């Protein structure tokens, strides 16, 4: 800002781009996530299993709504938590600006579109960060559901809901002479249980709840670390970030403890969500920082000119400089002869 007045920038493409490009892309992502989650447009891959495999013989824990961390609670947390954090952070940044002695922050311009629409920097930042977060949230859902549909990896309680007829399948029970499973079943009609429960039990890898929680906490923790400014304390921001990471970890533990997912499913979900959040924060919203008002980027040579420099120790110590000059034959400054003056 110059003279306390904000920079004004006129743009006639911001509203059409938001309506016809970004909103359409977000709608496509939401529609694809809905198709993968609630319809059978993409059938789940039928993966075979070994007879009497103890890996998939855990008891049925009940419907998802009966879990200690039901999906409704997970969806509420991953939606409300980051939204409130970003909203409070942007409001604090707008009403309590950093003091002049703090690290300088590049200011944004106020966009004027047409004769009626004016978008201030706080509004632009809020819409940008929350819009990108929403896009990433549905993208994480797509990645998790696509992985479940393609792999068809059974849950730990798969055999409890599948209820296969081992006699009809020709499976023999384990014995001292044959401790392990003896046959791999690939028949699609091997399960006699409820088709809906069997289909849900084939969607274990990766864990969608773990992916959503990891995405939400990674995005929010990076926002807290990169945007919040706490003066005089080094432990406030790490404490907030660890407090955000704790619920996501507990969600993964509960999924494993209730025999709804394997540890590998939860870890894959954590990696998926964290990777998507890191990519969006780093490459899309540029670490939640504003871009310079001018569109021209510095060349590498100009950028080197702004790099921090280090003074030579010889310039700080004139005695050492004098010794080096004397050693190489240069006369000491005090012993130089004055130039002759013509008479």
Swiss-Prot record:
In the UniProt record, the signal sequence range is none
Q: Where is this region: Disordered?
A: 290-343
Q: Which UniProt keywords apply?
A: Glycoprotein, Membrane, Phosphoprotein, Transmembrane, Transmembrane helix
Domain of life the protein comes from: Eukaryota
List the glycosylation sites: 165
The way it spans or sits in the membrane comes to: Multi-pass membrane protein
Please name the GO terms of the biological process aspect recorded for this protein, alphabetically. phospholipid dephosphorylation; phospholipid metabolic process; signal transduction
- GO-annotated cellular components: plasma membrane
Pfam families per UniProt: PAP2 (PF01569)
| UniProt KW Transmembrane helix keyword | yes
The question of whether DNA damage is a record keyword is answered with no
The cellular location(s) given in this protein's UniProt record come to: Membrane
- Indicate the transmembrane segments per the record: 12-32, 69-89, 129-149, 210-230, 239-259, 266-286
In terms of SMART domains, this protein maps to: acidPPc (SM00014)
Compositional bias, Basic residues, is annotated for 322-335
Q: Which positions carry Phosphoserine? A: 299, 312
**Main location class:** membrane
Q: Which PANTHER family match?
A: LIPID PHOSPHATE PHOSPHATASE, PHOSPHOLIPID PHOSPHATASE-RELATED PROTEIN TYPE 2
- The protein's name in its UniProt record: Phospholipid phosphatase-related protein type 2
Query: Which gene is this protein's source?
Result: PLPPR2
